[in-house]
Amino acid sequence: MSLLPDADTFKRLTDGSLRGPGPAAARAMLAGISVPYGWIVAARNIAYDRRLLAVRGGGVPVISIGNLTLGGTGKTPLVAWAARTLAAAGRRPAIVSRGYGAKPGEVSDEAAELALVVPGVPHVADRDRVAGARAAVTRGADVIVLDDGFQHRRLARDLDIVAIDATDPFGGERLFPRGLLREPPASLRRADAVVLTRAAAVDAESRAAIRRAVIAARGGDSSMLWAEASHRPVALRDHAGGLHDLDRLRGCRVAAFAGIGNPAAFRSTLTGLGADIAAYTPFADHHAYGDGDLEALAATVRTSGAALAVTTLKDLVKVRRLDLGGIPLVALEIAATFSVGGDELAAAVVAASQSVAR
């Protein structure tokens, strides 16, 4: 058995869902590896805290949006929200990211997804985020939204926002690779704001308990901004960026597909929006679509009698088509909507964008 075959299997391995002697042995080995990993993380953080490692400015204010754990915490909708908030305030934001998964000269899936939902906002992908920020400034940006920046301490920031998934806030409370924590919860002391994502997925008592746990991890410091957000479908988008109302799904016969960690949840969302699902094809998370996949999907769409093909934005930017088998193809756009602290967080984002650049 491969220890890390895909993100979903890795999560089930670390949370104990995979049982038997093989997974148990793998967990024991991963626990051993997590010890030196923790030492490295601690040493690196101490070096930054004591200024033994240099922190560089990007030339303009920087707003970082990151997380404490591996895997999806709903960070991408927050990045899009921050970029829109800044643009609405008259700023010229650019998004800077590492560009995970992209080959040199190519655009990452995440960058392509953000280009659809926040058109006109430059996106610079660079392993060296300081260089990326400075490149964005040369393209006219007066504020940087740093994607996945919490652990990238080399680039100075004016606001540090951390997203925590309400359904698994602390990654099994174990450091990688035994768990999903990229660094210990005590690192939340660095955060200026914490956003509880997928907040509607848990009850009020659980949300309050997570907030108390965050404050405890910060040594009792409750001064951080606290916000709660949920991921809700807001529109349908095609590959050209065109917007379509969600009402188009109601009573519509659709053929759907998705390559995400929880494809059943996507199907449930479509059903909840009133779609009549004639065919549904799940793929593995992060699936790379080949010509054979697209031909098979087109055949499925045609034979199902669907009037519309629907997928996720994450998949649409990989498929890069306006139709499948002559049937229009659209993606469900998900956005972060705040139930607690949204106005305060927006004000903090705008205020940080007006800081004196370092």
Predicted regions and their residues:
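C-terminal accessory "lid"/substrate-recognition subdomains
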Residues: 1-18, 169-308, 355-358
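A transmembrane-helix-recognition feature enriched in membrane-embedded lipid enzymes
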Residues: 5-59, 352
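Walker A (P-loop) phosphate-binding motif
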Residues: 46-101, 200-201
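Hydrophobic residues at beta-strand termini and immediately following loops
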Residues: 65, 96, 164, 229, ...
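Phosphate/Mg2+-binding loops and adjacent switch elements
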Residues: 91, 95-220, 226
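Short, polar loop motifs at secondary-structure junctions
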Residues: 148-150, 313-317
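Short, flexible loop segments at boundaries between secondary-structure elements
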Residues: 232-234, 284-288, 326-357
